[in-house]
């Protein structure tokens, strides 16, 4: 029984770690996306087609 308990404990620990890491990553991504979107409006006037195409592709992928 001790062996099983030990295994489950380590498993849950790794799970928690992954969840925490993923959450922080997502938060950062959201922030950068908002910032880039704000600044992208100014650059859109110079390179309309290229910048727009690249941005839309990136948003869909992420």
UniProtKB/Swiss-Prot annotation:
The keyword NAD does not apply. GO terms for molecular function: DNA binding. Testis. Keywords: Chromosome, Developmental protein, Differentiation, DNA condensation, DNA-binding, Nucleosome core, Nucleus, Spermatogenesis. Residues 1-62 are annotated as: Disordered. One of its GO terms (biological process) is sperm DNA condensation. The keyword Phosphoprotein does not apply. It is found in: Nucleus; Chromosome. Its main location: nucleus. One of its GO terms (cellular component) is nucleus. Belongs to the protamine P1 family. Protamines substitute for histones in the chromatin of sperm during the haploid phase of spermatogenesis. They compact sperm DNA into a highly condensed, stable and inactive complex. This is Sperm protamine P1. It comes from Pseudantechinus bilarni (Sandstone dibbler).
